[in-house]
């Protein structure tokens, strides 16, 4: 294994607004996505905002899945982070996008834990 984990950041647009605003549906979708990927679910926490929107997290033994939904824009911000090489986060990310009826899907995968990031000296800020 070259990395400690894989992190998929998914931008989902033109989603079904009713699904994005249904906390119970989104929670079930995320738990099912984790299970479809072969992950072990540990904790689940979701919150419904007024007048609309859902945020939530599914903690898995291998890391986490998160969402912030904006039904009024048909948009969802989704993260799927898995540690190790046993679980493929893309399986969960695609399952979620399908479940939200996302017509536009932009996924970026970032390898995690590959060592210190080299930052040019001019951009480093020291916080006291």
Swiss-Prot record:
GO process terms (BP): spermidine biosynthetic process
Catalytic activity as recorded in UniProt: S-adenosyl-L-methionine + H(+) = S-adenosyl 3-(methylsulfanyl)propylamine + CO2
Keyword hit for Lyase: yes
Post-translational modifications: Is synthesized initially as an inactive proenzyme. Formation of the active enzyme involves a self-maturation process in which the active site pyruvoyl group is generated from an internal serine residue via an autocatalytic post-translational modification. Two non-identical subunits are generated from the proenzyme in this reaction, and the pyruvate is formed at the N-terminus of the alpha chain, which is derived from the carboxyl end of the proenzyme.
Similarity section: Belongs to the prokaryotic AdoMetDC family. Type 1 subfamily.
Cofactor note (record): Binds 1 pyruvoyl group covalently per subunit.
Enzyme class: lyase
Cofactor: pyruvate
A family per Pfam: AdoMet_dc
Lineage, highest ranks first: Bacteria, Bacillati, Bacillota, Bacilli, Bacillales
EC number(s) on file: 4.1.1.50
Annotated pathway: Amine and polyamine biosynthesis; S-adenosylmethioninamine biosynthesis; S-adenosylmethioninamine from S-adenosyl-L-methionine: step 1/1
Presence of the UniProt keyword Chloroplast in the record: no
GO molecular function, one term: adenosylmethionine decarboxylase activity
Pyruvic acid (Ser): residues bearing it: 63
Alphabetized UniProt keyword annotations: Autocatalytic cleavage, Decarboxylase, Lyase, Polyamine biosynthesis, Pyruvate, S-adenosyl-L-methionine, Schiff base, Spermidine biosynthesis, Zymogen
Annotated protein name in UniProt: S-adenosylmethionine decarboxylase proenzyme
Top-level lineage group: Bacteria
Active-site residues (renumbered): 63 (schiff-base intermediate with substrate), 68 (proton acceptor), 83 (proton donor)
Known partners and oligomeric status: Heterotetramer of two alpha and two beta chains arranged as a dimer of alpha/beta heterodimers.
GO CC field: cytosol
Organism: Exiguobacterium sibiricum (strain DSM 17290 / CCUG 55495 / CIP 109462 / JCM 13490 / 255-15)
Known function: Catalyzes the decarboxylation of S-adenosylmethionine to S-adenosylmethioninamine (dcAdoMet), the propylamine donor required for the synthesis of the polyamines spermine and spermidine from the diamine putrescine.
Site (Cleavage (non-hydrolytic)): 62-63
């Amino acid at each position: 294994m070259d990395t400690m984990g894989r992190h998929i950041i998914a931008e989902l647009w033109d989603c079904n607004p009713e699904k994005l605003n249904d906390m119970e549906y989104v929670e079930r979708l995320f738990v099912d996505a984790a299970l479809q990927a072969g992950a072990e679910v540990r904790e689940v926490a979701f919150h419904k905002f007024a007048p609309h929107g859902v945020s939530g997290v599914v903690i898995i033994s291998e890391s986490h899945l998160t969402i912030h939904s904006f039904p009024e824009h048909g948009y969802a911000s989704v993260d799927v982070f898995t540690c190790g090489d046993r679980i493929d986060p893309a399986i969960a990310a695609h399952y979620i996008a399908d479940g939200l009826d996302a017509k536009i899907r932009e996924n970026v995968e970032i390898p995690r834990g590959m060592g210190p990031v080299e930052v040019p000296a001019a951009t480093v800020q020291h916080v006291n």
